[in-house]
């Protein structure tokens, strides 16, 4: 599949992937804006409110009926964080023209409906309906609270909040509970007008329709959107290493400790760092899993994640409170083993295979392709999955070791039980 990216209007770009192997087409529209603590919650709430109805289809029942008429098409709202960019919008999925009864064309009516959801939402006196705002605000607060209920997710979020305190990357895609609870309809509508007027709009299409049809359908569907004084898509800034390791402990009513460790990466060798992280803790054959969890039984789980947009690696683990120091020391010991090249051939080849397979499967799913290219756009990269896989296949062990030698501990976060000894 050969990707193309076309400017349709000021601040409006279309990424198109022609494909005939799927029975559906996918159409996505995403507003790209800097993520900030002050605006994240309102912008996260916005697409849920927009999805409640348009002036022509003023409630979810009417919208659902129209989607049913389009052979069960779907329009779902999305809230994502890519690098230091908050991406809010919609993804539509519908039967590809090649598979509709009589070859009926669905691209144009689906694009038109998507344009109504974005540009002509149901309003009263120039504001969103209060009942829609209230209902979706409750859902947003519940989503934020659900992170707290899953202590693994909560600890991962708290590590990023502490490591990237004062930086956009430390802000949750949903914002914080206090801000979300206090949101008013006026604030949500202000967020709407702000995004319409200044946020870049990234469109994505994957299906069999020609470029001319896709562009014409989207131009017609979005013709009523205001002219944009567009901000640039924010590019993530690499995290600057601290002179001293930051250590944070939270006390909570938990029975299992959560140890998180954040590391800075001083190298920009992306392929080498991807391989190094996979060897360290990015797969079920990685050193953290095989040694810290399986061999030494110091963790219930242990894994690492390379945040390429930010140039950091984070470790997530669940431990007994009394095993904090042992797990902490062993995690660093396993990192040093990778840095020193203490790896078997099967580990290297296993890591290559894991990453190459992951890149290969992106092309098997339209939603994965959309998510991948949204991330590439948000971070200013244009590498294809195939190019990334080739980079992994050809990176030498020496490059991996050298890149991983630049990885250093920055932040330690520990969630433990109240009154528990460490």
What are these regions (language model features)?
Residues 92, 100-149:
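Hydrophobic alpha-helical hairpins/lids featuring a short glycine-rich hinge
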Residues 15-17, 23-43, 60-116, 152-175, ...:
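M16 family metallopeptidases and their MPP-like homologs
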Residues 64-65, 120-144, 230-240, 333, ...:
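Acidic/histidine-enriched alpha-helical segments
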Residues 16-42, 193, 200, 219, ...:
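His/Glu-based metal-binding/catalytic segments typifying zinc-dependent metallopeptidases
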Residues 185-221:
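Non-catalytic, conformational "gating/processing" segments within enzyme and secreted inhibitor domains
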Residues 110, 191, 214-217, 272, ...:
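Hydrophobic side chains in well-ordered alpha-helices
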Residues 43-51:
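Active-site SXXK
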Residues 1-18, 210-247, 402-422:
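Proteolytic maturation boundary segments
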């Amino acid at each position: 599949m050969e990707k193309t990216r076309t400017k349709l209007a000021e601040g409006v770009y279309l990424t198109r992937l022609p494909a005939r192997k799927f029975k559906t087409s996918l159409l996505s529209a995403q507003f790209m804006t800097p993520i900030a603590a002050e605006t994240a919650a309102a912008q996260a709430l916005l697409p849920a409110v927009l999805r409640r109805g348009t002036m022509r289809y003023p409630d979810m029942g009417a919208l659902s009926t129209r989607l049913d008429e389009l052979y069960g098409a779907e329009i779902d709202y999305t809230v994502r964080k890519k690098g230091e960019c908050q991406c809010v919008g919609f993804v539509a999925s519908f039967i590809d023209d090649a598979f509709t009864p009589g070859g009926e064309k669905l691209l144009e009516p689906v694009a038109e409906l998507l344009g109504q959801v974005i540009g002509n939402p149901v309003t009263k006196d120039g504001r969103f309906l209060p009942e829609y705002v209230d209902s979706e605000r409750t859902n947003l607060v519940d989503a934020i609270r659900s992170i707290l209920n899953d202590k693994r997710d909560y600890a991962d979020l708290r590590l990023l909040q502490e490591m990237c305190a004062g930086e956009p990357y430390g802000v949750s895609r949903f914002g914080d509970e206090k801000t979300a609870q206090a949101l008013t309809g006026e604030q949500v509508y202000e967020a709407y007008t702000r995004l319409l007027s200044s946020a870049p709009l990234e469109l994505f299409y994957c299906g069999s329709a020609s470029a001319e049809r896709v562009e014409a359908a989207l131009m017609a569907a979005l013709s009523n959107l205001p002219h944009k004084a567009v901000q640039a898509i924010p590019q993530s800034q690499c995290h600057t290493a601290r002179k001293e390791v930051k250590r944070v402990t939270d006390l909570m009513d938990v029975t299992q400790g959560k140890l998180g460790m954040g590391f800075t990466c001083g190298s920009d060798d992306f392929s080498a760092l991807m391989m190094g992280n996979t060897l360290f803790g990015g797969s079920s054959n990685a050193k953290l899993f095989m040694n810290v969890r399986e061999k030494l039984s110091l963790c219930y789980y242990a894994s690492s994640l390379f945040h390429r947009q930010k140039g950091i690696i984070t470790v997530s683990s669940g431990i007994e409170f009394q095993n904090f120091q042992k797990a902490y020391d062993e995690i660093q010991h396993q990192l040093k083993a990778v840095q020193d090249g203490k790896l078997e051939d099967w580990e290297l080849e296993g890591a290559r295979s894991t990453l190459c397979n992951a890149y290969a499967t992106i092309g098997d799913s339209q939603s994965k392709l959309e998510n991948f290219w949204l991330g590439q756009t948000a971070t200013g990269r244009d590498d294809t999955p195939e190019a990334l896989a080739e980079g992994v296949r050809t990176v030498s062990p020496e490059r991996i070791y050298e890149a991983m030698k630049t990885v250093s501990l920055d932040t330690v976060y520990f969630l433990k039980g109240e009154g528990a000894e460490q």
